[in-house]
From Swiss-Prot:
It comes from Schizosaccharomyces pombe (strain 972 / ATCC 24843). GO terms for molecular function: nuclear import signal receptor activity. This is Protein OPI10 homolog. It comes from the Eukaryota. Belongs to the OPI10 family. Keywords: Cytoplasm, Nucleus. One of its GO terms (biological process) is protein import into nucleus. Pfam families: Hikeshi-like_C, Hikeshi-like_N. InterPro entries: Hikeshi-like_C (IPR048364), Hikeshi-like_N (IPR008493), OPI10 (IPR031318). GO terms for cellular component: cytosol; nuclear envelope; nucleus.
Length: 200
């Protein structure tokens, strides 16, 4: 009924049913996980009025609510990178096996679950960044890309518009078109790529 993919790994095939409406995936070497995708398998929709809550658990810790799936939202990406802060500093953080829990419940139960279930897990459900922050990241990405193609020489057979000064810089329109295509491709492959964007 469910599938899961940890970023950089193969599809998880170790789903176990632990109760009539509860399932778990065992996640080996969980300390290296950043993101996980959870999804409904094709041709296995929820019964009408049902959905699934998704949880994450470190060994010896309570389950932490990540989000949910429904027939209208059959897949979701969850950020796990900073959940390791819930472990004690004295615990060995290498080779840890964590659990991904899925609980099938009536949709009416979904309004009762907070975005984050414990104070120790305050970094799981990441809020959307402000529009100005996203715009700044996009413009920085664009500037860095265009600057790498800037030239002080007007390309051959080009006609300058307006007054040209000796220190003017030129960027071919093709470069902007290339950036736009590459940006959209990156965005479709990873909607969160701007969060760690240090590259062109």
């Amino acid at each position: 009924m469910f599938g899961a993919i940890c970023a950089g790994r193969l599809v998880q095939t170790n789903l176990q049913q632990v109760a009539d409406n509860q399932f778990v995936f065992q996640l080996d070497s969980a300390e290296s996980l950043n993101h996980i995708v959870v999804f409904l398998l094709p041709n296995s929709p929820f019964p009408v009025g049902m959905g699934a809550k998704v949880y994450f658990q470190w060994p010896g810790k309570p389950f932490q609510f990540l989000g949910y799936l429904t027939n209208e939202k059959p897949s979701a990406i969850f950020r796990l990178k900073n959940t390791i802060q819930t472990l004690s500093e004295n615990e060995n953080c290498v080779g840890i096996t964590a659990m991904l829990g899925i609980s099938v419940e009536p949709l009416t139960n979904f309004t009762e679950t907070p975005a984050v279930s414990t104070s120790a897990s305050n970094v799981i459900a990441k809020p959307l960044p402000p529009v100005t922050s996203v715009a700044q990241k996009i413009l920085t990405n664009l500037y860095n890309f265009l600057a790498s193609f800037a030239t002080s020489q007007l390309p051959p057979n080009s006609i300058g518009l307006g007054d040209l000064r000796p220190n003017d810089t030129f960027i071919p329109l093709r470069v902007f078109q290339d950036w736009h295509a590459k940006f959209l491709n990156k965005l479709s492959n990873n909607p969160n790529f701007l969060d760690s964007e240090d590259q062109i």
